[in-house]
């Protein structure tokens, strides 16, 4: 497990983060409904050559969760920009997944953040997105938030399992589910789904173009959440190279094929 011993207060939200390794900076940004623990088998591989920063998005993992909180994509890029400023980063390497990918792109095009390289995979970046489950929860947040614990836990773990191509162990499922359980966590889980809004990617999608850093786009061939075709389209917009298909992998490449991500980041940082 990765340790997140630090807390930063950003726009009234407590954001938990950690840092390991030494060398130039690398920032890892997780997606939904996960936490920075998705990087536990990946970022330790870079500690001999990079100082790796990782954090839990606002409303996720160990970061603060509370009623009435804005945890949408509309705030996450602002949080990333604030963390860059606090950490004193100018052009770090960036590794981003899912909502983390959307956050990295929004921060680049809207907040002016710049990266030494961007490795982005299975990202929420192009419309349409949002599964039928997401659309249903958006319209019935209160009903889902009030479900009995055992029903919520069963639904949550079943949902998490669909992110991976290979069976995820009970231990790993429990790790990912833990922040979303209990009175605070259960409400927070449905809150973040209810706030999923395509307008936050629509407003930046028109700005997509070749970025001023090397961009590597990877995508799980078996991603049931965001189809591979979106990875192909995204690569054409922001990179000078085609998408890299990841075989035997679903949306959660960190669990299915972590070695592919390690290799991609090493290639990106070694080629500069």
Predicted segment positions?
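Conserved HGGG/HGGXW glycine-rich cap/lid loop of the alpha/beta-hydrolase fold
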Residues: 19-62
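Conserved serine/cysteine hydrolase catalytic core
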Residues: 185-236, 245
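Active-site loop/oxyanion-hole signature of alpha/beta-hydrolase fold enzymes
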Residues: 53-96, 263
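Flexible "cap/lid" loop of the alpha/beta hydrolase fold
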Residues: 109, 115-147
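Catalytic active-site module of serine/aspartate enzymes centered on a nucleophile-bearing elbow/loop
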Residues: 241-272
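Conserved alpha/beta-hydrolase catalytic His-Asp/Glu region
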Residues: 129-131, 149-210
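Gly/Ala-rich beta-loop-alpha elbow adjacent to hydrolase catalytic centers
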Residues: 96, 100, 104
């Amino acid at each position: 497990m990765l340790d997140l011993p630090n807390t930063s207060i950003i726009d009234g939200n407590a954001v938990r983060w950690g840092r390991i390794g030494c060398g130039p900076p690398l920032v890892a940004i997780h997606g939904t409904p996960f936490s920075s623990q998705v990087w536990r088998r990946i970022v330790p591989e870079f500690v001999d050559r990079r100082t790796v920063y990782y954090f839990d998005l606002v409303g996720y993992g160990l970061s603060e969760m509370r009623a009435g909180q804005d945890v949408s994509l509309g705030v996450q890029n602002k949080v990333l920009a604030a963390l860059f400023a606090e950490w004193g980063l100018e052009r770090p390497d960036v590794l981003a997944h899912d909502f983390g990918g959307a956050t990295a792109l929004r921060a680049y095009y809207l907040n002016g953040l710049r990266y030494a390289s961007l490795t982005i995979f299975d990202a929420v970046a192009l419309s349409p997105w949002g599964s039928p489950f997401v659309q249903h929860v958006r319209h019935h947040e209160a009903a889902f938030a009030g479900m009995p614990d055992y029903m919520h836990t069963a639904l949550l773990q079943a949902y998490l399992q669909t992110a991976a191509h290979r069976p995820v162990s009970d231990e790993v499922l429990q790790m990912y589910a833990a922040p979303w359980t209990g009175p605070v966590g259960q409400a927070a889980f449905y809150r973040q789904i209810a706030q999923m809004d395509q307008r936050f990617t629509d407003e930046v999608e028109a700005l997509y173009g070749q970025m001023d850093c090397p961009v590597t786009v990877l995508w799980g061939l078996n991603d049931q959440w965001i189809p591979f075709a979106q990875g192909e389209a995204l690569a054409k917009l922001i990179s000078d190279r085609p998408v890299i298909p990841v075989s035997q992998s679903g949306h959660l490449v960190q669990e299915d094929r972590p070695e592919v991500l390690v290799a991609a980041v090493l290639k990106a940082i070694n080629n500069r």
